[in-house]
Amino acid sequence: MLSHLADLQDYFGPLRLLRYITVRTLLAAVTSLTIGFVIAPWLIAKFRELKLGHGYIDDRTGALGATYFDKKNTPTMGGLIIFLSVFTSAALWAAPNIWVFVSLFVYAALTIPGWRDDYLKVVHKNRNGISSWEKIGWQSLATVVALGLLLWHPASAQKIREFWVPFVKYPLIPHMHWAVLLVLIYLWIVGFSNAINLTDGLDGLAIGCTIPVALVFGIMAYVADHVFLSQYLLTSHVPGTGELAVICGALIGGCMAFLWYNCHPAEVFMGDTGSLALGGLIGVMAFMIHQPLTLVIVGGVFVAEMLSVVVQVGVFKITKRRSGVGRRFFLMAPVHHHFQKKGWPETKVVLRFWVLSLGCALAGLATLKLR
């Protein structure tokens, strides 16, 4: 929106800087950071006043339950802090185009079921929240509408059909059938939506791991939009996706503001309101800039968390079917709880996972040069 102020540069010269994506990305980060710091104390106080916190300790934590006693009644729905910060900042500083619109649509659409899930848990004391089918329904609807918009708009109709993989300097699939495209984009949006949701189990863990992912994809979005850089690095050129770097800037600022209040001991939890939407936003952006498999590398911590649950459930079912007694591969899943069971303090688990996330992000960024 504010990018159009650059048209007034004849009246005020410095406004010409708004033509540069890098400048608006920085402004988006500062804006979302500021909004987050302004609204977070008020929202946290309001959540406490309304008693919008989990009033129970999850039985699945077992012996870890005592560790979480101090977190009982900590306000949740903190994802609203991130959403208001990121969405407002991105809407202000990103130049409107189909890529921006679809990204913000997916982000908003997946915030709704997350908020509803948290609402049922903290207001109606429904420990299960929304049903799995309702959650899948929302995620499916968001995916179908997003893909429909991308296939309808002339600026994205052809580009979105290309499928690129790391280390290869041409599209592996130049023109995907819409049905194949639907399956793939669904897997990325829903997969990473649920992956971040599973990772959000310790103070600051999920949000801290999201920041390096957003930083790397901001760089990749800028490269994809830049004619010279995309040609030099032999990556896909997707005109207009540079504006996604502005969204990533807003995401970094919003996450940093939230982390200030979510670090141990957390004053607020993001809840499903934040985690489901963040995963969907990152997933759809990765797909639109033709870096879906790179996300598997960059978001390695999230992938590991999700796979740990899949392995745990799979091993338990297989061993129970064969011997009648289910066995577990990990002491507890997701894997961050496994390390807690081994005696690691919560802060050590979180900090080490942050280090791993940064390493994964740098490894994914390095793939730009390897073709």
Curated annotation (Swiss-Prot):
Q: What is its EC number?
A: 2.7.8.13
GO function term, MF aspect, one: UDP-N-acetylmuramoyl-L-alanyl-D-glutamyl-meso-2,6-diaminopimelyl-D-alanyl-D-alanine:undecaprenyl-phosphate transferase activity
Does the keyword Cell inner membrane belong to this entry?
yes
The entry's localization annotation reads:
Cell inner membrane
What are the GO cellular component annotations? Answer: plasma membrane
Q: Which CDD domains match?
A: GT_MraY
User: Which Pfam families does this UniProt record tie to the protein?
Assistant: Glycos_transf_4, MraY_sig1
For biological process, the GO terms are: cell division; cell wall organization; peptidoglycan biosynthetic process; regulation of cell shape
Q: Which InterPro entries does the UniProt record give?
A: Glycosyl_transferase_4, PNAcMuramoyl-5peptid_Trfase, PNAcMuramoyl-5peptid_Trfase_CS
CC cofactor: Mg(2+)
Its biological function?
Answer: Catalyzes the initial step of the lipid cycle reactions in the biosynthesis of the cell wall peptidoglycan: transfers peptidoglycan precursor phospho-MurNAc-pentapeptide from UDP-MurNAc-pentapeptide onto the lipid carrier undecaprenyl phosphate, yielding undecaprenyl-pyrophosphoryl-MurNAc-pentapeptide, known as lipid I.
Q: Which family does it belong to?
A: Belongs to the glycosyltransferase 4 family. MraY subfamily.
Tell me the protein's name: Phospho-N-acetylmuramoyl-pentapeptide-transferase
**Gene this chain is encoded by:** mraY
